[in-house]
């Protein structure tokens, strides 16, 4: 299966963060520590540590900013990659990362035979948290996630980008213990694409017979049909993910086929054959209303994000919930690249009017604090950087997590 690789804070606070972390692309090359330990560095400040994730792009390493003592994530891609995407992804992050819910990007440059992008280190993904909660989320948790992610996707779309990679692994909470810990972040823009032509300023044309881009479990029906993706497809994929969280699984999971192509065909056929009413049965009508709306959108049409958000905020209020960031995983020990964290119960968000409550999150920062003597970035730089397997990306095999997923007892349920 071919995959198309084409691609809250004010200015003062943002400036402080930039000056503190030394962000922006640098012309500095890679330098070693100059010691016998052979410490691998990215740029002048970032020490490369242990492997914490992998994907078709290459791999992800834990890193440390030696100037600020903050942990970071370092994404590595072979310079001679057959489908290089990291520099384009860096450019997209630069377009997006001045807002809440998108990780800060600190640096892009060479690292030996690799390109390296240094990012803010975040917490567990929604898929990891889903596992932690026995693979079902309550309605309250799903609505708090949905309200935030509609806002995230709207922001991405306002920057002339479509995301095209909706899956729980690509939405992460902030670092446990930080002010960002309750905010849902969107990561991995390796499959993102400009839907507004930067030259003509016009919407990209409608096309058919496109190769599949994304994760088959969540992608829109039109994507299965080979149609060019636009804003509507991101929102439909989100709707499928919301139902996955509520139901625990989707009707098109676990399908068997002799080839990947046949399997994707079966997944698409089952999606089309599953009425929205059946998919959303026993759940609030708003879930079905959401999916009906996004599936009826025209290719060129701008979605009414306020309408979709209001669907869920009204349901949230009628259900008597409080937007207190008390997710289903609150109080559970959370895995991180630097050890398990036992988070405190989240405090009440600052008082604000009702309209703000459901469209903005708490003010965030990314300070990680001083490192202890058991620094997980120390002593790992000499570990070889594994080249990505020479295979095409396929369905759930695409992975770009901000820390290594734990192995599961059974892979069947994830098909």
UniProtKB/Swiss-Prot annotation:
Annotated region Phospho-regulated basic and hydrophobic (PRBH) motif: the residues are 369-415
Record's function text: Serine/threonine-protein kinase. Casein kinases are operationally defined by their preferential utilization of acidic proteins such as caseins as substrates. It can phosphorylate a large number of proteins. Participates in Wnt signaling. Phosphorylates MTA1. Phosphorylates COL4A3BP/CERT and SMAD3. SMAD3 phosphorylation promotes its ligand-dependent ubiquitination and subsequent proteasome degradation, thus inhibiting SMAD3-mediated TGF-beta responses.
How is the polypeptide modified once translated? Answer: Autophosphorylated. Phosphorylated by aPKC which promotes dissociation from the cell cortex.
Its name, as the record gives it, is Casein kinase I isoform gamma-2
InterPro entries, sorted: Casein_kinase-1_gamma_C, CK1_Ser-Thr_kinase, Kinase-like_dom_sf, Prot_kinase_dom, Protein_kinase_ATP_BS, Ser/Thr_kinase_AS
Compositional bias annotation for Polar residues: 20-38
| Keyword terms, alphabetized | ATP-binding, Cytoplasm, Kinase, Nucleotide-binding, Phosphoprotein, Serine/threonine-protein kinase, Transferase, Wnt signaling pathway
Q: Which domain of life is it from?
A: Eukaryota
Q: Where in the cell is it found?
A: Cytoplasm, Cell cortex; Cytoplasm
């Amino acid at each position: 299966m071919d995959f198309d690789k084409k691609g809250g804070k004010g200015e003062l606070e943002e400036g402080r963060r930039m000056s503190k972390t030394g962000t922006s692309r640098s012309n500095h090359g890679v330098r070693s520590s100059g010691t016998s330990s052979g410490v691998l560095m990215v740029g002048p400040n970032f020490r490369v540590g242990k492997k914490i994730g992998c994907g078709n792009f290459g791999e992800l390493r834990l890193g440390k900013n030696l100037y600020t003592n903050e942990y970071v994530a370092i994404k590595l891609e072979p310079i001679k990659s057959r489908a290089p995407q990291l520099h384009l992804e860096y450019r997209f992050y630069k377009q997006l990362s001045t807002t809440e819910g998108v990780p800060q990007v600190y640096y892009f440059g060479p690292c030996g035979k690799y390109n390296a992008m240094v990012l803010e280190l975040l917490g567990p993904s929604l898929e990891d948290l889903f596992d932690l909660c026995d693979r079902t989320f309550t309605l309250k948790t799903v609505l708090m996630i949905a309200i935030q992610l509609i806002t995230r996707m709207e922001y991405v779309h306002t920057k002339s980008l479509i995301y095209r990679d909706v899956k729980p692994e690509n939405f992460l909470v902030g670092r446990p213990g930080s002010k960002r810990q309750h905010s849902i972040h969107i990561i991995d823009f390796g499959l993102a694409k400009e839907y507004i032509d930067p030259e003509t300023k016009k919407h990209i044309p409608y096309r058919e017979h496109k190769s599949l881009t994304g994760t088959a479990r969540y992608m829109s029906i039109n994507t299965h049909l080979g149609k060019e993706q636009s804003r509507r497809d991101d929102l439909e994929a989100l709707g499928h993910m919301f139902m996955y969280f509520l139901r625990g699984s989707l009707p098109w999971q676990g399908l068997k086929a002799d080839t990947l192509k046949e399997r994707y065909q079966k997944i698409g056929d089952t999606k089309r054959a599953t009425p929205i009413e059946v998919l959303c049965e026993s759940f609030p009508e708003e879930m079905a209303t959401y999916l009906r709306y996004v599936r009826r959108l025209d290719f060129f049409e701008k979605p009414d994000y306020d309408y979709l958000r209001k669907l869920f905020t009204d349901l949230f209020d009628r259900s008597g919930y409080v937007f207190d960031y008390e997710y289903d995983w609150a109080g559970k020990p959370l895995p991180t690249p630097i050890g398990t964290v036992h988070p405190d119960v989240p405090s009440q968000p600052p008082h604000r009017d009702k309209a703000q409550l459901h469209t903005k999150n708490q003010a965030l920062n990314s300070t990680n604090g001083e490192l202890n003597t058991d620094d997980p970035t120390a002593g790992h730089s000499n570990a070889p950087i594994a080249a990505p397997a020479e295979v095409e990306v396929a369905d759930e095999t695409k992975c770009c997590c901000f820390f290594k997923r734990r192995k599961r007892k059974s892979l069947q349920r994830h098909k």
